[in-house]
């Protein structure tokens, strides 16, 4: 399968399941309402009790003045601080859980559409896929988070080592220290970008492994890494999709940004544009997922099924070697009767007598 065929198949899959884009838009609306209810109301109560003028929030000078002495502020309004922090944590938990649930259902519908393209979209099927795929995807997300934390820790160690080398070089020559600082920074940035892109690609292909093979988190990630190592063109396909997603999302956000500079009216006008921008980003994200699922299915699942079916045809019995009747005249002729045996000895004796 070529890149163009995979991308075309991904767009075709999502265009036939446009309800998934509507689910993404509904998720954004629910998140906005949830932020207002869970976080906005406690913050409003806190601002009123703190004596903060809500009309001056655009300048943010009152907020900086309020938090100029954080220890005194926390000691004076401890219960309000705890309430606001708890509200933010609850909101993050709510948004993460709901987003993961919707993503599980969307990934399940996309994978099911690849297995059975004729199956139509239904809300019942969406919730069924979300229920089946939620916990495997949750544990997979937790595992990937640990991987990113480990990578960040390793890069932190390398950054500290580079800082120590540059500091030691400053004592000898400032020009050498400047050169080493720029050189190591560029190398570290290039390695970090390449490694993070590879990890993200393995993560997305791991979701495909998680759906089609129903493996565990570690096995899914490991098989995705092996798949990308054996078929490196799959990595370049995801790189192309990732860059396309970034470019289109940037232009979609750039269209709505100038309206923020217009007072009052700009905020009203920019909100529908932001909604459209979010819908476009959600649509492109689903297309990227569908392309990855399709490419992995065609190269790994479908090809392995074809390979396992070939030996069955190779060992088929030869028709000439089977025990079937022949139609040749020689084989269909009657079997000759055995020649008559000689007379028995007893009969010869009677005839002589």
Give the role of each language-model region:
Residues 149, 153-160, 197-207:
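Transmembrane alpha-helix/helix-exit interface in multi-pass inner-membrane proteins
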Residues 24-25, 88, 141-142, 238-239:
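Residue-level recognition of transmembrane alpha-helices
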Residues 30, 34-35, 86-90, 94, ...:
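Hydrophobic alpha-helical transmembrane segments of multipass integral membrane proteins
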């Amino acid at each position: 399968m070529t890149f163009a065929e995979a991308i075309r198949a991904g767009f075709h899959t999502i265009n036939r399941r446009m309800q998934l884009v509507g689910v993404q838009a509904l998720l954004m609306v629910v998140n906005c309402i949830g932020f207002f209810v869970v976080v906005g109301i406690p913050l409003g109560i806190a601002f009123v009790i703190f004596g903060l003028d809500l009309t001056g929030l655009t300048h943010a000078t009152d907020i900086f003045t309020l938090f100029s002495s954080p220890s005194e502020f926390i000691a004076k309004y401890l219960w309000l601080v705890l309430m606001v922090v708890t509200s933010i944590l609850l909101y993050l938990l709510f948004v993460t859980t709901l987003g993961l649930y919707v993503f599980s259902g969307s990934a399940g519908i996309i994978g099911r559409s690849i297995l059975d393209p004729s199956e139509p979209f239904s809300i019942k099927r969406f919730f069924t896929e979300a229920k089946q795929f939620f916990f495997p995807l949750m544990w997979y997300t937790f595992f990937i988070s640990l991987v990113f934390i480990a990578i960040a820790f390793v890069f932190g160690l390398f950054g500290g080592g580079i800082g120590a080398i540059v500091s030691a070089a400053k004592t000898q020559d400032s020009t050498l220290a400047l050169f080493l600082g720029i050189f190591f920074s560029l190398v570290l940035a290039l390695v970090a970008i390449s490694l993070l892109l590879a990890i993200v690609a393995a993560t997305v292909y791991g979701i495909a492994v998680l759906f089609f093979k129903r493996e565990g988190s570690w096995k899914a990630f490991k098989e995705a890494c092996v798949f990308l190592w054996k078929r490196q063109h799959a990595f370049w396909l995801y790189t192309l999709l990732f860059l396309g997603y970034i470019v289109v999302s940037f232009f979609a956000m750039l269209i709505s940004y100038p309206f923020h500079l217009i007072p009052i009216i700009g905020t009203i006008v920019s909100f529908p544009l932001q909604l459209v921008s979010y819908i476009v980003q959600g649509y492109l994200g689903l297309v990227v997922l569908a392309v990855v699922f399709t490419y992995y299915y065609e190269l790994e699942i479908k090809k392995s099924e074809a390979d396992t079916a070939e030996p069955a045809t190779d060992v088929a019995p030869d028709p000439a070697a089977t025990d079937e009747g022949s139609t040749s005249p020689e084989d269909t002729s009657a079997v000759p009767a055995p020649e008559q045996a000689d007379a028995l000895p007893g009969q010869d004796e009677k005839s002589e007598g």
